[in-house]
Amino acid sequence: DHMFRIDRFEKVYLHKNDVEKIREDENCFAAALSDGGKYPHLVPIDEGSVIDLGGGVTVDVLNLGGHTENSVVFACAHYKALFTGDAIGSGYIILMICPEKDMYKVLESYKKNLECFLPRAEALRDYAWFGGHSIQENGCDEQHQQDYLAGRSVYYNPLRLEIVQDMVVLCEKLITGEI
């Protein structure tokens, strides 16, 4: 969902299923383009794809659908960094884009995807995990957002393996109606 103005790039890496959607309907991600913009060269990626950043640095693509159907995360062994975007919430919230009527179906799919990701995440335990929004790590409670924005938040829950485990539990509790 963070692909606004992708037409300003020569080449864009995008999950293979989203590339296929664009090929079938160029308007499916119309908000991604500037007015009158055209899609750049789209490079399909999927679980196991490796993107060469140059200088001997690569990132491995790991599927983690949920925030969007085809969300991915990127692991960089060179810098021991995992870039999760919005694919992993914070243990406090689940960041998903779906119609409300599809919420439980998407939650069940997200839970399954998190469970599949867990064994891979174990190998990334000692990596630095970077989310899409720093507020994810500082709680999203509206009463405390101003504290976070002012740099005086007392809540800090950095993204890490345990958050993935917490998100599985959170999904289950939402699915069963416990919360």
Regions found by a protein language model. Name each.
Residues 11, 16, 21, 38, ...:
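Context-gated lysine
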Residues 58-65, 69-159, 166:
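Metallo-beta-lactamase
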